[in-house]
């Protein structure tokens, strides 16, 4: 599988790299797991509904979520800061 980023998601990740290295490490670990097993594993993966149908979410913390979409051989990151956009 390959990993790609929406512009806003990449900016979210850059924010963590600049402000909270531990959070960035946690996100990296979740990303690796998303590439191996996109719909199971840590962070309580759950399919999203309504406007985000087709996307999945994993908990980074109580406040922040990793939101991504699996399409074929690609995992596209939509957000990694706050809740659902």
Outline where the language-model segments fall.
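A short, surface-exposed loop/turn module that caps and links secondary-structure elements
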Residues: 32-59
